[in-house]
């Protein structure tokens, strides 16, 4: 039995702030961050946007690409920034897209890989027959404390994928995961901003898990990097996925179509999924996609995906990912702080 993606959609808020604008406020060297992180600007949610609205927009774009909301039997939303501690984002999405009441829904958390965990769970639910189709979403309005290095990259956006047994635009050939207890990045209940281990987030966190899961996938599938047309890795910045890709033997040409972070920042649970959406926007039938996510705490999910002939029928039915990214309105730091709730405007 083949499982795959039958529809997809992404959404990125239109507002941006440049690295220079943030650096100016904190007295930092913008070039150090731009070159060190390989990020020029990041997306910023509007004052009335949150993870729920982003998830809804991404889901609506997936519906526009041919998914029937009445056939969706499960909705899972992965995020680090669900708007409610007790009230699922997934039920908000279900109501907004007109999904039936006879369904299951849940919110997921696993740092930046909660969205790909939602894809894997959707695959299991569909394979078991409990749902005809399932909707998996990764979305975030990422947090970064004022003046922290995370503030240069923590962004907003998300992507949605409908998983089914039929009508695939892309077949998921295999998925596998690598997981360990690694405290590289965390946020306690009630805290406004996450804390992180600085450089500890690199080799012991990101690279150990991304490289291990990726090598596991290549070994399981008996493939090599040259067998794939595209490669997408979790992108907390532009530097990490580039290093991971080159270490594994992928080329920059395979990576660049899905490398969205340099122009929109790190969307946390949406990062690898927005990258996959960008690749599906341009992919051709028969092309193969390699995807590996990463979530602090820590774990990585890898996917081997083959695009089908149906992809050309749906690509132009909803806004494309890079169209969202290129549609930018720039903010100064004061406006950005208001949009992000860093300034309390309540009387």
Swiss-Prot record:
Protein name: Hydroxymethylglutaryl-CoA synthase
Entries under InterPro entries matching the protein: ACP_syn_III_C, HMG_CoA_Synthase, Thiolase-like
Signal sequence annotation: none
EC number: 2.3.3.10
Database matches in PANTHER family: 3-HYDROXY-3-METHYLGLUTARYL COENZYME A SYNTHASE (PTHR43323), HYDROXYMETHYLGLUTARYL-COA SYNTHASE (PTHR43323:SF2)
Pfam family, one: ACP_syn_III_C
Family matches, as HAMAP family: HMG_CoA_synth_arch
Catalysed reaction, written as an equation: acetoacetyl-CoA + acetyl-CoA + H2O = (3S)-3-hydroxy-3-methylglutaryl-CoA + CoA + H(+)
